[in-house]
């Protein structure tokens, strides 16, 4: 008995070797048009890799074959069966040549023209008219999709170029304005607590500068020292970790003119080598009039009063800008200053213009020799005749009108005025009466929001949390399986289950408000020293949520 070779067992583990299957023109062949391959045995010892059978479970085709256009699904999957697989003949392709820029790449078809065995094609026989028409329709669809893709790409490039045009005009309109960082422009939106008359970021910094400056001045003034700007600058910069300059002092004087008296004095002891005793220095003296009641020292109460006055002056400045903004609306609005509790939602607080610094006393101007004629007149007796002649020639040369030293610098061009804003074209065709009603209703909402007191704002915030709290409260009663629970137990369960971080006392206030709005669903019973909460679990929760939303909408106007 002959010994079996290892290669004899390959036929048992793998499907039989078959002849290479003909590659059709379409990328996805149809199983119905394939012919069962004939099993052949290779004479070589090398194991040939057989192609996959149509009926066997094979992995998904390559990604190149899967990424096809939707229009190619109608391509013919196969051609008629051949009578002689060994006689390949290229088919006659009456369709026009494919566009190289079209999405369908014709390279697989060209590559298989000379090497593919076409199934079911006799020598001298051309494909049917149906397959030719389908190929032509696929090619037309591919060319159409390619043209659409090119048009879309051109449209995207045009849209990318258009936004750069208005940006190039911005530096010509406002060349000196620098855009502030985001944490400064949106500082008012990040303030904790209830919304109110929030100051801009630059005004908040100025308030802190005044507080630091007042603290340093009070310390030096109470010790009977001469307060100079150099001492105050060093102390304020150490407290705030920010630059403090004379411009900031001028802004403080603009906001609070009666806070300090500024003078230029000399012969002030400095105890520093960088500043001479004979130099003029800016001295600061606090004005203790009505705030301190005639006292000679700055106390903590006086500092607090001065800080409140400074902040109130800044608020009044922002109110003036807010009033101008309300007058520019359509229709214009007017809110009394004593009833204003918060800014208009569209009023950008951080875009309020900066405070112009006031003029501070400057050191007296001493006589300085700036021209050659003055030097010649002052030191004529100290110079030799040769030096005197050279200086006189230089003075005459510099006094000529055509000399380059007398040319005046050109004045900066006045920036063009900002054109008025054009009326929006989106409202074209809309009834004017409808627009007036909508604007009047919007004005009513904004007025109610700007004049709302803090208590109403707090109640509105609680109303917005009630729908979620009602759902959590019902789940607590369902899990406890009791008709009534004590207030302490309910508050503890809801604090642990609610997403919003609330204290037990705040949660109890929410439950009292919920019982006030929905007495038929939730009731509170005071028994001895405890308060019991009773809930009707049979009531539909969706209806309760709708009622709470109606309350929020009614009180939010």
From Swiss-Prot:
<dbReference type="GO" id="GO:0071163">
    <property type="term" value="P:DNA replication preinitiation complex assembly"/>
</dbReference>
<keyword id="KW-0656">Proto-oncogene</keyword>
<keyword id="KW-0235">DNA replication</keyword>
<feature type="short sequence motif" description="PIP-box K+4 motif">
    <location>
        <begin position="1"/>
        <end position="25"/>
    </location>
</feature>
<keyword id="KW-0158">Chromosome</keyword>
<feature type="modified residue" description="Phosphoserine; by MAPK8">
    <location>
        <position position="107"/>
    </location>
</feature>
<dbReference type="GO" id="GO:0003682">
    <property type="term" value="F:chromatin binding"/>
</dbReference>
<feature type="region of interest" description="Disordered">
    <location>
        <begin position="20"/>
        <end position="113"/>
    </location>
</feature>
<dbReference type="GO" id="GO:2000105">
    <property type="term" value="P:positive regulation of DNA-templated DNA replication"/>
</dbReference>
<comment type="similarity">
    <text>Belongs to the Cdt1 family.</text>
</comment>
<feature type="compositionally biased region" description="Pro residues">
    <location>
        <begin position="407"/>
        <end position="422"/>
    </location>
</feature>
<dbReference type="GO" id="GO:0033262">
    <property type="term" value="P:regulation of nuclear cell cycle DNA replication"/>
</dbReference>
<dbReference type="InterPro" id="IPR014939">
    <property type="entry name" value="CDT1_Gemini-bd-like"/>
</dbReference>
<feature type="region of interest" description="Interaction with GMNN">
    <location>
        <begin position="163"/>
        <end position="203"/>
    </location>
</feature>
<protein>
    <recommendedName>
        <fullName>DNA replication factor Cdt1</fullName>
    </recommendedName>
</protein>
<dbReference type="InterPro" id="IPR036390">
    <property type="entry name" value="WH_DNA-bd_sf"/>
</dbReference>
<feature type="compositionally biased region" description="Pro residues">
    <location>
        <begin position="82"/>
        <end position="106"/>
    </location>
</feature>
<keyword id="KW-0137">Centromere</keyword>
<comment type="function">
    <text>Required for both DNA replication and mitosis. DNA replication licensing factor, required for pre-replication complex assembly. Cooperates with CDC6 and the origin recognition complex (ORC) during G1 phase of the cell cycle to promote the loading of the mini-chromosome maintenance (MCM) complex onto DNA to generate pre-replication complexes (pre-RC). Required also for mitosis by promoting stable kinetochore-microtubule attachments. Potential oncogene.</text>
</comment>
<dbReference type="GO" id="GO:0003677">
    <property type="term" value="F:DNA binding"/>
</dbReference>
<dbReference type="GO" id="GO:0030174">
    <property type="term" value="P:regulation of DNA-templated DNA replication initiation"/>
</dbReference>
<dbReference type="GO" id="GO:0072708">
    <property type="term" value="P:response to sorbitol"/>
</dbReference>
<dbReference type="InterPro" id="IPR045173">
    <property type="entry name" value="Cdt1"/>
</dbReference>
<dbReference type="GO" id="GO:0016604">
    <property type="term" value="C:nuclear body"/>
</dbReference>
<dbReference type="GO" id="GO:0000776">
    <property type="term" value="C:kinetochore"/>
</dbReference>
<dbReference type="GO" id="GO:0000076">
    <property type="term" value="P:DNA replication checkpoint signaling"/>
</dbReference>
<feature type="modified residue" description="Phosphoserine">
    <location>
        <position position="392"/>
    </location>
</feature>
<feature type="region of interest" description="Disordered">
    <location>
        <begin position="397"/>
        <end position="427"/>
    </location>
</feature>
<keyword id="KW-0832">Ubl conjugation</keyword>
<keyword id="KW-0539">Nucleus</keyword>
<dbReference type="GO" id="GO:0005634">
    <property type="term" value="C:nucleus"/>
</dbReference>
<keyword id="KW-0597">Phosphoprotein</keyword>
<dbReference type="Pfam" id="PF16679">
    <property type="entry name" value="CDT1_C"/>
</dbReference>
<comment type="subunit">
    <text>Interacts with GMNN; the interaction inhibits the binding of the MCM complex to origins of replication. Interacts with MCM6. Interacts with CDC6; are mutually dependent on one another for loading MCM complexes onto chromatin. Interacts with PCNA. Interacts with LRWD1 during G1 phase and during mitosis. Interacts with NDC80 subunit of the NDC80 complex; leading to kinetochore localization. Interacts with KAT7. Interacts with ubiquitin-binding protein FAF1; the interaction is likely to promote CDT1 degradation.</text>
</comment>
<dbReference type="GO" id="GO:2000104">
    <property type="term" value="P:negative regulation of DNA-templated DNA replication"/>
</dbReference>
<feature type="short sequence motif" description="Cyclin-binding motif">
    <location>
        <begin position="65"/>
        <end position="67"/>
    </location>
</feature>
<keyword id="KW-0238">DNA-binding</keyword>
<dbReference type="GO" id="GO:0051315">
    <property type="term" value="P:attachment of mitotic spindle microtubules to kinetochore"/>
</dbReference>
<keyword id="KW-0995">Kinetochore</keyword>
<dbReference type="InterPro" id="IPR038090">
    <property type="entry name" value="Cdt1_C_WH_dom_sf"/>
</dbReference>
<feature type="compositionally biased region" description="Low complexity">
    <location>
        <begin position="69"/>
        <end position="81"/>
    </location>
</feature>
<keyword id="KW-0131">Cell cycle</keyword>
């Amino acid at each position: 008995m002959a010994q079996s070779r290892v290669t004899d067992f390959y036929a048992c583990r793998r499907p039989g070797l078959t002849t290479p299957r003909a590659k059709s023109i379409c990328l996805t062949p149809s199983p119905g048009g394939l012919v069962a391959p004939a099993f052949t045995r290779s004479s070589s010892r090398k194991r040939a890799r057989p192609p996959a059978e149509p009926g066997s479970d094979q992995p998904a085709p390559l990604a190149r074959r899967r990424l096809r256009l939707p229009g190619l699904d109608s391509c013919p999957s196969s051609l008629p069966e051949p009578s002689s697989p060994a006689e390949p003949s290229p088919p006659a392709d009456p369709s026009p040549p494919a566009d190289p820029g079209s999405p369908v790449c014709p390279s697989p078809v060209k590559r298989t023209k000379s090497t593919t065995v076409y199934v079911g094609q006799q020598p001298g026989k051309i494909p049917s008219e149906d397959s030719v028409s389908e190929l032509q329709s696929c090619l037309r669809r591919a060319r159409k999709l390619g043209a659409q893709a090119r048009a879309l790409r051109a449209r995207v490039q045009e849209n990318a170029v258009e936004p750069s045009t208005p940006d190039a005009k911005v530096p010509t309109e406002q060349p000196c304005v620098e855009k502030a960082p985001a944490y400064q422009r949106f500082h008012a939106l990040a303030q904790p607590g209830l919304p109110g008359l929030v100051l801009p970021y630059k005004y908040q910094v100025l308030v802190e500068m005044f507080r630091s400056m007042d603290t340093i001045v009070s310390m030096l003034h109470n010790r009977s020292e001469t307060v100079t700007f150099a001492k105050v600058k060093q102390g304020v910069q150490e407290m705030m970790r920010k630059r403090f300059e004379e411009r900031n002092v001028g802004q403080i004087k603009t906001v609070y003119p009666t806070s300090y008296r500024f003078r230029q004095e000399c012969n002030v002891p400095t105890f520093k080598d960088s500043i001479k005793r004979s130099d003029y220095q800016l001295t600061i003296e606090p004005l203790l009039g009505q705030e301190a009641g005639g006292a000679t020292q700055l106390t903590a109460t006086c500092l607090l009063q001065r800080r409140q006055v400074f902040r109130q002056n800044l608020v009044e400045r922002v109110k003036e800008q807010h009033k101008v903004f309300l007058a520019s609306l359509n229709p214009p609005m007017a809110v009394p200053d004593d009833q204003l509790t918060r800014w208009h939602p569209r009023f950008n607080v951080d875009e309020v213009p900066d405070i112009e610094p006031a003029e501070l006393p400057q050191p007296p101007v001493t006589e300085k020799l700036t021209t050659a004629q003055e030097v010649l007149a002052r030191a004529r007796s100290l110079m030799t005749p040769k030096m005197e002649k050279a200086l006189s020639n230089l003075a005459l040369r510099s006094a000529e009108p055509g000399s380059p030293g007398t040319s005046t610098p050109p004045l900066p061009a006045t920036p063009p005025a900002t054109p008025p804003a054009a009326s929006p074209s989106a409202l074209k065709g809309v009834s004017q009466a409808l627009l007036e009603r909508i604007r009047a209703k919007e004005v009513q909402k904004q007025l109610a929001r700007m004049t709302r007191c803090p208590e109403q704002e707090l109640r509105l915030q609680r109303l917005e949390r009630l729908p979620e709290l009602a759902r959590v409260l019902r789940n607590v009663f369902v899990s406890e399986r009791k008709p009534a629970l004590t207030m302490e137990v309910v508050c503890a369960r809801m604090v642990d289950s609610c997403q919003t971080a609330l204290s037990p006392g705040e949660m109890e206030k929410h439950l009292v408000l919920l019982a006030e709005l929905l007495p038929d669903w939730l009731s509170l019973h005071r028994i001895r020293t405890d308060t019991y909460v009773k809930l009707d679990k049979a009531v539909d929760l969706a209806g309760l949520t709708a009622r709470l939303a109606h309350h929020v909408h009614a009180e939010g106007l």
